[in-house]
Amino acid sequence: DGLSVRILADNHTDRYSVPVATPGMKIDRTGGTERPGVPPASTWRAEWGLSMFAESVLGDETKRVMIDFGYTAEALLGNMGFIGLDPATIDALVLSHGHTDHFGGLLGLLAASKGKLKPGLSLFVGGEDCFCSRQTVAGGDFGSLDRPGILAAGIKLMLAEAPAVAAGHAVVSDQIPKATKE
């Protein structure tokens, strides 16, 4: 049994970081262009946002869950291609919350993977407020999650307003209230 998490986007890349191994955990680094078989024009893309790909093994069963989708499809798809991650292997999609830097690459992923994703693939979101329009601190448009676009791509939308299980392996929490110190 085990869990592997690949970071596809996280605001940062450091091509000179070295792998780390400790008991029960191994951290591999990706980002440079000196990998065998990868042309020098190809490299890891860093940008604002978050995307992770979790692979869990339970007995002889393996499940793959993509958590968040970064800010742009260009970076998400580029990084997926860089490490050879096939969208057809995804068993579930999870969105942590409705900010553009977490869902921005989703529709591009769905468009690029049309006809390749598993039938009935589910997207777990925390609730209806994930679809709210948001504004930046300066009052600009921060985007909103496109429900019609998601449904048109054949994705099964799961409003996880209570804890849920994604792909039979991953627990998705319900909404976590935001509290400020003010």
Where do the language-model regions lie?
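Short internal beta-strands
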Residues: 94, 120-131
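Metal-dependent catalytic neighborhoods of phosphoester/phosphodiester hydrolases
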Residues: 104-113, 135-136, 143
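Divalent metal-coordination and catalytic microenvironments
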Residues: 5, 54, 68, 80, ...
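Active-site environment of divalent metal-dependent phosphoester hydrolases
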Residues: 15, 74, 99-103, 130-133, ...
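Pre-active-site segment of Zn-dependent metallo-hydrolases
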Residues: 43-48, 56-92, 108, 115
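Zn-dependent metallo-beta-lactamase
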Residues: 1-62, 167, 172-182
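Metallo-beta-lactamase
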Residues: 90-101, 128-182
